[in-house]
Amino acid sequence: MINKILDLYTRCGKSLLDNGINDAVLPISVANEALALFSEAKWVVLGGDVYQYENDEMKNFYADWYCNLVVPSESCNYAKEHLQKLRGDNIYISFTIKN
């Protein structure tokens, strides 16, 4: 399972190192795939940060969320519901997870 998650980040992810953050983001177009993998791996999604890629840089989209659910499938569903509400071009997501 970890290999599938790492493969998704390798294929689709973008680094936030230029923003001074040691993390990576995924395009919203693969967010549901990531959430399904997290749920299958029994990882709890604690929240996430939302970015918009503009003019060759990641900018905060100010649509971050936090979740205190402890059941992996419930936390992933909460994240999915939040992300479905977002509108905009070039949206990327950074997930905060607990395994």
Language model segments and positions:
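Short, compact, well-ordered microdomains
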Residues: Y66-N99
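Long, contiguous N-terminal structural blocks used for assembly/anchoring
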Residues: M1-P27
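A generic structural signal for short, non-catalytic loop/turn and secondary-structure boundary residues
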Residues: F38-W43, L86-N90
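Acidic, low-complexity, intrinsically disordered interaction modules
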Residues: S39-A79
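Hydrophobic alpha-helical transmembrane segments of integral membrane proteins
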Residues: A34-L35
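Residue-level signal for secondary-structure boundary elements
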Residues: L17, W43-G47, I91-S94
